[in-house]
């Protein structure tokens, strides 16, 4: 019942006080079950039907889908329930206590992005959801900060096909209609160890990796020359060498060397094509040294994403906000939601505060975000 729904700031406070960290390191990783229970209770109080979905392959993680209304189409509002880990020594405040100071709300997840659910709940407390003419769906996903397992699983298993979706990531209320993808790979070279006094008796993995890196750099230059999307601030696919490790002693021929790298493809570039380009680039090394070079995924790949610029969702949101949609270089769950329906990324707070010590959301976003949610629900679910 709506009269038992807590005030906006208390909802926000409860969300921040409920840890839901995602991490690849098991000791840091946390279940989001408690947070899902909170959200499920609140949306039930608003009259929504609530379904909690276990996400396979995770450490006790769940999605939640709250729905109201009947028929086809409608609107999906979605976001992730998890946060990144925090560096205790760099925070000046308790990350799990919502702190109001200097027109800012501080806490882990205030901007990225647990707070978005407080905005949705607050905007809907005055809406009679029984009178909506089209369905309204609220999706809370798991593990966005690591594998995006929640969004991947939901998009593969749901039969829902809303008219459109909005992901409430922190965009400073600037609507985003496209972003790059992300592919992270590990290149491994297996050499043959031996005493450094006789190099011919071994195969130095560092030397082979040096050769491989030269070919990878040629691929980087080729991607920059062949592909272009003017709307992006970095208008070409980027390739970054992020981490390398090999060997264990100066007087020993290096037996193993490992390189971690990523590629951020433009929308429209297929992941299979990029994998093919990387394998082609490394083919000369593999041919010279059969069986000594392998490439594997570090994390599941994320494709690039683009919402058609002439879609009704883009037109409506641009009109409501009085601003044009934009594109960004970072990734969200949008590619997976886009398989269900046209999707925009649009939410309160700045991406510059995401993953930072003393994360905060400026209070100036509160009123316009509440108004925006009310307006898009009215447009897509009442008309």
Swiss-Prot record:
The protein, known as: Acetylornithine deacetylase
Residues that span the membrane, as ranges: none
Substrates-to-products reaction catalysed: N(2)-acetyl-L-ornithine + H2O = L-ornithine + acetate
Keywords: Amino-acid biosynthesis, Arginine biosynthesis, Cobalt, Cytoplasm, Hydrolase, Metal-binding, Zinc
HAMAP family: ArgE
Parts forming coiled coils: none
Highest taxon, organism lineage: Bacteria
Pathway(s) where this gene product acts: Amino-acid biosynthesis; L-arginine biosynthesis; L-ornithine from N(2)-acetyl-L-ornithine (linear): step 1/1
Family stated for the protein in its record: Belongs to the peptidase M20A family. ArgE subfamily.
Principal subcellular localisation of the protein: cytoplasm
Annotated Zn(2+) 1 binding sites: 80, 112, 169
Gene Ontology MF term list: acetylornithine deacetylase activity; zinc ion binding
Location relative to the cell: Cytoplasm
Organism taxonomic ancestry: Bacteria, Pseudomonadati, Pseudomonadota, Gammaproteobacteria, Enterobacterales
Cofactor note: Binds 2 Zn(2+) or Co(2+) ions per subunit.
SUBUNIT field: Homodimer.
Protein residues bound to Zn(2+) 2: 112, 145, 355
């Amino acid at each position: 019942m709506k009269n038992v729904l807590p005030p906006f700031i208390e909802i926000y406070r409860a969300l921040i006080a409920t840890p839901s960290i995602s991490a690849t390191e098991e000791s840091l990783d946390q279940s989001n079950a408690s947070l899902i229970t909170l959200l499920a209770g609140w949306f039930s109080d608003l009259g929504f039907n609530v379904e909690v979905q276990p996400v396979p392959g995770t450490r006790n993680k769940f999605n939640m889908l709250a729905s109201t209304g009947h028929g086809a189409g409608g609107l999906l509002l979605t976001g992730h329930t998890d946060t990144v880990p925090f560096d205790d020594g760099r925070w000046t405040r308790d990350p799990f206590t919502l702190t109001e100071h200097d027109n800012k709300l501080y806490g882990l997840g205030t901007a990225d992005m647990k707070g978005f659910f407080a905005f949705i709940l607050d905007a809907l407390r005055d809406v009679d959801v029984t009178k909506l003419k089209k369905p309204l769906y609220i999706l809370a996903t798991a593990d966005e900060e690591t594998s995006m397992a929640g969004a991947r699983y939901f998009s593969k298993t749901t039969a829902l096909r809303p008219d459109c979706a909005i992901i409430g990531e922190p965009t400073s209320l600037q609507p985003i209609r496209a972003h790059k993808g992300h592919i992270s790979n590990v290149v491994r070279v297996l050499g043959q160890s031996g005493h450094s006094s006789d190099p011919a008796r071994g195969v130095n993995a560092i030397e082979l990796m040096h050769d491989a890196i030269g070919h990878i750099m040629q691929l980087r230059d080729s991607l920059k020359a062949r592909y272009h999307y003017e709307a992006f601030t970095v208008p070409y696919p980027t390739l970054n060498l992020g981490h390398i490790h090999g060997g264990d002693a100066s007087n020993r021929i290096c037996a193993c060397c490992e390189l971690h790298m990523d590629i951020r493809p433009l929308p429209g570039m297929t992941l299979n094509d990029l994998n093919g380009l990387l394998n082609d680039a490394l083919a000369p090394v593999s041919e010279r040294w059969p069986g000594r070079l392998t490439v594997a995924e570090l994390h599941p790949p994320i494709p690039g994403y683009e919402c058609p610029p002439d879609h009704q969702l883009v037109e409506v949101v641009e009109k409501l906000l009085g601003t044009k949609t934009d594109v960004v270089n970072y990734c969200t769950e949008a590619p997976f939601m886009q398989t269900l329906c046209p999707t925009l990324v649009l939410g309160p707070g700045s991406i510059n505060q995401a993953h930072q010590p003393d994360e905060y959301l400026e209070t100036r976003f509160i009123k316009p975000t509440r108004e925006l949610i009310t307006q898009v629900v009215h447009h897509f679910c009442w008309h």
